[in-house]
């Protein structure tokens, strides 16, 4: 068919060398529809709209007469068509991508051919993104191996976020001198270093809680702690006597300010518990199931909890009784000591009674009563 067309064109060229071609009814080319993969979309034509209208590709082209391209300096002959090879530039090369060497080659080509011996990622000093080789097909579609790279080429990556391993070309990724590096100590480490002396001070204050009982109050009371406002403390503060109202070494007592009470305690905690008894406040609640009883003092709550658990760890060495609290056992031991004193006093009283002189006439009276004979 190509030979017949060439023959007809050659005969027309010899007969009418200066015949003008008829006006062609041209239609603009449609956009290229990719058929290599179902995921491929519409891709625009590489030609401009003006060039599309100037191409002689209409459906009613008559090859019986010679024709020439608008704007071309020479006519197109059969020899020109035959001489156009897939690799030689010709009038149809405008329809192809500049990088394409064949008419039916894919519209997308890999921009960087992959190396077989390269790693799965490669850093280039002149680029701003990591170029993925095409040997790994996990991130590229089979129909368009370079589609992903064409989309990633316009982005500007942050190399500090990528954090690649040491690379001979990765020296440009390091920040300039004076900048903050990701591998440097964060601000949180500095905050921890600042907070270290505070934690040491807290540990030293906690160690003070484990000191002996006599050395706890060697340090004067700080301003943040509450001061007892009982009448005795107020009087001592007014007189300026630290040990007591009389200024001696007598133990200072904290008395109740309620009129008519007058109870005094050696510890402020005991006075506060006593004042809660006056006010009716019971802040200590039993959390046992279905109990919910409230108490004024914490030791009362602990004693109540032992009734739930049934634990009694203070047995009496004299009798078989067991107590929940040591003070209860000490009070119980006093009963045993009192019983011993009573027994000792009773024994001494019996001894005194045995050595005493009997009243006169007593023995004779018994003998008289015993010697009386029964009457008939």
Curated annotation (Swiss-Prot):
The protein's name in its UniProt record: Transcription factor Sp6
Region described as Disordered: 1-70, 167-223, 333-376
Protein source organism: Homo sapiens (Human)
Single GO MF annotation: zinc ion binding
SMART domains in the record: ZnF_C2H2
Motif 9aaTAD: positions: 118-126
ZnF (C2H2-type) intervals: 254-278, 284-308, 314-336
Segments of skewed composition (Low complexity): 173-186
Biased composition (Basic and acidic residues): 333-343
Domain notes: The 9aaTAD motif is a transactivation domain present in a large number of yeast and animal transcription factors.
Compartment(s) where it occurs, according to its Swiss-Prot or TrEMBL record: Nucleus
SUPFAM superfamilies: beta-beta-alpha zinc fingers
Similarity comment: family membership: Belongs to the Sp1 C2H2-type zinc-finger protein family.
Keywords, in A-Z order: Amelogenesis imperfecta, Disease variant, DNA-binding, Metal-binding, Nucleus, Repeat, Transcription, Transcription regulation, Zinc, Zinc-finger
GO cellular component: chromatin; cytosol; nucleus
GO biological process: epithelial to mesenchymal transition; odontogenesis; regulation of odontogenesis; regulation of transcription by RNA polymerase II
Gene responsible for this protein: SP6
Disease cited in the entry: Amelogenesis imperfecta 1K: A form of amelogenesis imperfecta, a disorder characterized by defective enamel formation. The enamel may be hypoplastic, hypomineralized or both, and affected teeth may be discoloured, sensitive or prone to disintegration. AI1K is an autosomal dominant form characterized by hypoplastic enamel in all teeth.
Gene3D superfamilies per the UniProt record, alphabetical: Classic Zinc Finger
Role summary: Promotes cell proliferation. Plays a role in tooth germ growth. Plays a role in the control of enamel mineralization. Binds the AMBN promoter.
Expression across tissues: Ubiquitous.
CDD domains, sorted: SP6_N (cd22544)
Main location, first listed in the record: nucleus
